[in-house]
Structure formats: structure tokens, C-alpha cells
A protein has these predicted regions:
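Bacterial N-terminal signal peptides
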Residues: 11-22
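Short hydrophobic alpha-helices and adjacent helix-cap/hinge residues
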Residues: 27-329
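N-terminal secretory signal peptides that target proteins for export/translocation
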Residues: 1-8
Length: 329
């Protein structure tokens, strides 16, 4: 079984060569063919974990090729559309038996406009919060949606912070963060507390906003991906100087900048998608496979930021929470 990867970031010449069929001689033909289309890029922790789950579960069942849309870094709408067209060209030329996708942009720019209710089977994963906005499921598409433990996390924050009334949400200027923010706004309204927010485009803006957010009871840390000038060490250096309030996140890769995390397990998405693809390869009808939400989650603690913040966490959380180690990407 072969594994190959092409990224939009390497230029579309590489894609055209792939479509033309000029593949390395080491790749062996397989009875079944799987294409994995990631919305993002290698090195983005969430995407890497989904990929790992996919690769582990389809291994031995099909020849796997991968295309990375790179839409976090190449995030102009026209660039994303070009990436989607490049993925489409691979599908039309190589004719995979099943296509697995990760995250929203692969659905929005590839599946919905070109393959809705067509013949090619698609298994999506990492789709934020709901599939309804894309009219899913289709006759040829099913998958797993990604639901963050928002309510559980906010309830936990309320149990830690006395007289919790005001929170601040800080994230990046991206489509996925707009969707995440809306979920927190709904949850905040349901629980009767004020939620202010900022979606920013630079690390300086992020740090300035974070410092100002210390006037709130709780700071909710959204995704930083989409902020191109992010410098991990600089951000951490500033955070340890300014943090005075509890910060929470549902993104594992944001734990180097956050006190407490209740996070999704990205690998779960890839494992489910890979296993589902294998079922389809074995003849199971995709129309009988329902769209499902993720179920797994982890609790994380950043002891370094906790120690300088003055925040006290309950002993139960301190015992059960995993301590971060090299999660920043």
C-alpha cells in the first residue's frame, strides 16, 4: 500500500504532476484507493492528529494519497477555491474509491459545490459544530462533526470562580473561530453571564487584548491559527506577566497559553473516518451510516501559568488533569 502527500503550499505544479500520473516508482498499485483531503497543513496539531487516526485505520485496506489544502495559511477565498479545484482534479484523474476529508473548508469548497449527491463516496471529519449549514448528509457523504465541550467547560469555570458574571472570548479572524464564538455566545446567554469578544489578526493585538481581558472573571482562549506572526515563546513570556484570571480553552494546542483545558480529541475524528471508509470499501452502504458527534475529551492543566496567576483549582481537577508537555503548534 502506498502513501503520498501533496500540499497546495508546494505549488500547483506538484498537483498537476500528480494528476498526470507521474508518481514515484516505489508506489505499488492497490485494489482499493483512498484519498485524504485535509483543509489545513502538516504541522498544525489538530490536522496532524486527524491524519494519524486516518492513516492508522486505513493501513492495509487501501492505497492512501493525501492533499493538504493549506487553508489556514493560504486563507484568501480565491486561494482556498484554487486548492479545492486542485483536489477535485486529483479526484477526477485518480478516481479514488472513497474520499476522506478533514475540517470545514474541504466540505465548503470541495464536497458541497462539486460532489453533493454524486457518485463518489465522501467521509468528512472535524466539521465544526453542525453539518446542517451544508445540507448534510448527502446520499454520498457522511461523517463526524466536532463539538467542543462548551457547556461543560463553562459550568466548570463557574464552579471555580466565585460570582462568575463576565467572560471574554479571544480568538483569530477565521471562519472556524466565528463558528466557535457563536456557540459560546449561545451558551453564555443560556447561563446568564456577559460574554464580550475579539477576533484578532496579529500577535501584538492578541497580547494587548489578553492583557485587557484580565478585567473579566474568566478568559476563554479560542484558536490562534490564522494569526501568521505568532511567536510561541514571546506570547508565553508575556502571558506569565499579565495573567491574573482563570483562562480556559477547548483546543489542546492552545494549552501552552491557557490555565485549564477541556479539549476534544482530534485523533478520534480520524479514527472514526478511517474506520468508516473501510466499511464503505467493504461494501457497506454510505446512506446507512449516520452523521455522529465526537465523544472523547481530555482535561489539561498548565501548571506554569497557574502558578503565577494566583488562581486556585480544586484538588479534584489537579489530581485528574493532564499536565501539558509540548502541545504548542
Amino acid at each position: 500500500m502506498g502513501f503520498q502527500r501533496v500540499s497546495a503550499h508546494t505549488g500547483f505544479l506538484a498537483v498537476s504532476l500528480l494528476v498526470a500520473g507521474t508518481m514515484p516508482a516505489t508506489v505499488q498499485a492497490a485494489d482499493k484507493k483512498c484519498l485524504f483531503v485535509s483543509s489545513y497543513h502538516k504541522g498544525y496539531a489538530h490536522a496532524d492528529q486527524i491524519e494519524a487516526g486516518v492513516r492508522e485505520t486505513v493501513k492495509g485496506h487501501c492505497e492512501l494519497r493525501q492533499f493538504d489544502m493549506d487553508s489556514k495559511r493560504r486563507n484568501a477565498k480565491e486561494d482556498i477555491k484554487k486548492s479545492a479545484l486542485a483536489a477535485k482534479a486529483i479526484i477526477e484523474s485518480w478516481k479514488p474509491d472513497v474520499v476522506i476529508t478533514a475540517d470545514d473548508n474541504a466540505v465548503k469548497y470541495l464536497i458541497e459545490p462539486f460532489y453533493r449527491n454524486k457518485n463518489t463516496p465522501f467521509v468528512f471529519s472535524g466539521l465544526n459544530w453542525t453539518a446542517a449549514e451544508y445540507g448534510l448528509p448527502y446520499s454520498n457523504a457522511t461523517g463526524m462533526i466536532e463539538v467542543g465541550p462548551v457547556g461543560v467547560m463553562l459550568d466548570r469555570a463557574a464552579s471555580i470562580v466565585p460570582r462568575f458574571r463576565r467572560a471574554f472570548y479571544l480568538g483569530s479572524k477565521t471562519l472556524s473561530e466565528e463558528k466557535n464564538l457563536k456557540r459560546f455566545q449561545v451558551a453564555a446567554a443560556k447561563r446568564g453571564f456577559v460574554l464580550d469578544h475579539a477576533l484578532v489578526g496579529s500577535s501584538n493585538e492578541w497580547l494587548k487584548t489578553y492583557a485587557g481581558a484580565q478585567e473579566y472573571d474568566v478568559v476563554i482562549i479560542g484558536n490562534r491559527h490564522g494569526i501568521e506572526d505568532w511567536n510561541e515563546q514571546n506570547v508565553i513570556g508575556e502571558i506569565v506577566k499579565t495573567t491574573r484570571k482563570l483562562s480556559v480553552t477547548n483546543h489542546g494546542w492552545m494549552m501552552p497559553y491557557t490555565i485549564l483545558g477541556m479539549t476534544k480529541v482530534s485523533r478520534e475524528q480520524g479514527e472514526w473516518a478511517g474506520k468508516t471508509a473501510v466499511r464503505i470499501l467493504n461494501g457497506y452502504k454510505i446512506s446507512k451510516i449516520p452523521v455522529v458527534p465526537n465523544r472523547q475529551r481530555d482535561v489539561w492543566i498548565n501548571s506554569k501559568i497557574l502558578a503565577v496567576s494566583g488562581v486556585k483549582l480544586p484538588q479534584g481537577i489537579m489530581r485528574k488533569g493532564k499536565k501539558i508537555a509540548g502541545l504548542a503548534r
